[in-house]
Amino acid sequence: MRLAAPLVALVVTATALTPAAPAQAAAPTVKISRIWYDSPGSPDSGANSSVNGEYVQVKNTGRSAVNLRGWTVRDQTTRADHVYTFGTFTLRAGKTVTLRTGKGRDTSTTLFWGRSGGGTYAYIWNQTKDTGYLRDARGRLVHSCSYNSARSDYKNC
């Protein structure tokens, strides 16, 4: 009996010192769900309807709303005008917002980057290869989506 107490203590100590399995990073609840990089029609005219034909969709797969104020979407270039910053916008649980490249009136489901004019310079997404980045208000990468194909007009992420 006198041996039982030290033996139990040894087992408890050994169990406490056993390293836990590494935790896997949780999948983001807000992510880029689609990039439509080749607007309909050819050639790309730079008209607002054509520019709005390219867009990125951001989806909240979580169970609670997420405040996107200060979050950014950008492509892989380092150009400052290729960054969209969310203003006051809350993405409800299970919902998707479409961010169109051109100009328009923002709604609860569609936002507009505000780019226009400049012909093909109004477009954001390259038609053959690019990467979309979604960052939170602190600048931390939340999700990215890359494509490398001219055989399709869009990429589901």
Residue ranges of model-derived segments:
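A structural motif detector for short, solvent-exposed N-terminal "entry" segments of globular domains
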Residues: 2-10, 19-69, 121-127, 147-156
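Solvent-exposed beta-edge/loop recognition patches
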Residues: 24-30, 42, 81, 88-157
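A mature extracytoplasmic/lumenal domain signature
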Residues: 36, 62, 70-72, 77, ...
